[in-house]
Amino acid sequence: MNNNEPDTLPDPAIGYIFQNDIVALKQAFSLPDIDYADISQREQLAAALKRWPLLAEFAQQK
């Protein structure tokens, strides 16, 4: 599983928070860790880097 994704779900009392469906399924069905890549997140990142060239420069320096 991607290291930057939380292993626990947020507290629903806090209000609307983005919920990772893979984490929810993993907890609901006691699934083992899987190597999952969020394709839509990658596409959004690529679009942001294309839209903002300065952001792309910072990403290359890292």
UniProtKB/Swiss-Prot annotation:
Null allele phenotype: Not required for cellulose synthesis in strain 1094. When disrupted in a cellulose-synthesizing strain (W3110 derivative with a functional bcsQ gene), cellulose is no longer made.
Any GO BP annotation: bacterial cellulose biosynthetic process
Induction context: Part of the yhjR-bcsQABZC operon, it is expressed about 5-fold higher than bcsQ (when the latter has a restored reading frame). Expressed in mid-log phase, expression increases dramatically as cells enter stationary phase, the increase is dependent on rpoS.
Keywords linked to the UniProt accession: Cellulose biosynthesis
InterPro entries: CBP_BcsR
NCBIfam families from the UniProt entry: BcsR_only
Note in the entry: Cellulose production is abolished in E.coli K12 / MG1655 and W3110 due to a premature stop codon in bcsQ.
Stated name of the protein: Protein YhjR
Lineage of producing organism: Bacteria, Pseudomonadati, Pseudomonadota, Gammaproteobacteria, Enterobacterales
